Amino acid sequence: MSKKPASKDTLGHRLSRATEINITVTGRKSGRTISLPIWFVWEDGTLYLLPVKGSDTQWYKNVLKKRTMRIDAGGAGAEVQAVPVNDATQVKSVVEKFRAKYGSGDVKKYYSKFDVAVIVQM
């Protein structure tokens, strides 16, 4: 996680154009860094993440243990603080944002549990 951070403008521009980002979290048991591609929504300086299996998603469980994570989009990246959300109204709002961006069919196809989300203020 030692890459040089991108300026917020560069990262924001990349996020506004991307359909997928890479996140890097720290394993809650192993302590190792784990990177994986995920879908996201970028809106008004806020990054919304929806774990595919909700609270059963491994990267989400890792974020509960250590809130610092790295996001990378098109060569720009930054370390950020993740805010886990389990309020049903807030989670529903994030799910609707995902449906608007990716389509209801794909969200239904790939996401199996809608009990949590993650919000990152940039």
Where are these regions (language model features)?
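Extreme N-terminal tail/first-helix region
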Residues: 1-20
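Short low-complexity stretches enriched in small and charged residues
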Residues: 1-7, 28-39, 71-79
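Covalent nucleotidyltransferase core used to form phosphodiester bonds in nucleic acids
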Residues: 11-13, 48-61
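Residues embedded in well-ordered secondary-structure elements
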Residues: 12, 27-29, 109
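Short, solvent-exposed coil/turn segments
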Residues: 16-18, 33, 64, 113
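Short beta-strand segments
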Residues: 18-52, 69
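Short, structured beta-strand-loop surface elements
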Residues: 54-122
